[in-house]
């Protein structure tokens, strides 16, 4: 696999040589991060491509474009080198701004169309809802933000995942995301390093939701109570009620409750595998933790791949219904606790 570099003006494009293959990594975090990091030395054979590597130049990996956002040039004696961080081109959405705002009952597609009406960079989007689970929710002054910020709001509001193919963006409900594989990860067997946090403090099996109230104080729909089938195993454990006036139908509230309820032990962890492993974004794998007798699916929500070496990837696995931001905060706290 070749890495290509082009200048900001896209006048020149060269194959990148002279980079340290052990330094080259691809980091992806669901809905949050996608970047390349690498180290490259300047030599007589790569002077042209080395000079192409600059702030805002492009790096191409497997057909995807990444933009150099951080570049550190250094010299030790006669050795000149650069440390490069390039983020996926979809992050350039943040350079456009939607000044206008919309309100009322809106679908995810309407919100996305409103966002990209302000796009000046050639982004396109597709919303795929094969099981028709998405419904309108009430928006109030949606807009007045950069496009990336507004997309993040839509992902959270409508419980979506975004998949980027350069500037072609696909949005799907979180329930439809990820391939269920037959791969198994067994604690202390398939890993050299494992750091799993298994938490039943947040385990709940029932939740009630309240939606919009009209000007006369009447509910648009009666409160919705969802009881998980897992209650037959764990008993009825009541989660704090959810109240959100953006919801005007019981069916849309029911979907939200099912996605909010943490009805199985929350599992989040980092692992380093013993062997090279081709992991896909959002893949589900079977997690086996024999000390607690646990056997259930967890999802790949982040990875760090070392593409040009045989070093296995580092994976973050989770079945936690928290957002990735919450997950990363949780992991950071766990790491700090371990250091003390």
Task: Describe every region a protein language model picked out.
Residues 1-31, 186-200:
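Solvent-exposed edge beta-strands and adjacent loop segments
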Residues 2-4, 179-299, 304-310, 322-325, ...:
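Acidic, small/polar-enriched beta strand-loop surface segments
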Residues 19-29, 69-76, 301-304:
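Short amphipathic beta-strand and strand-loop transition segments with alternating hydrophobic
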Residues 26-44, 79-91, 209, 259, ...:
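Oligomerization/assembly interface segments of phage tail-like spikes and tubes
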Residues 45-126:
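Surface-exposed cap/loop segments at beta↔alpha junctions
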Residues 72-93, 127-204, 208, 213, ...:
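Short beta-strand-centered interaction patches in the first periplasmic/extracellular domains
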Residues 89-92, 104-110, 321-340:
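Cys-His-centered catalytic/binding microenvironment captured across papain-like cysteine peptidases
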Residues 109-113, 148-151, 206-207, 254, ...:
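Extracytoplasmic/secreted envelope proteins and their assembly/folding machinery
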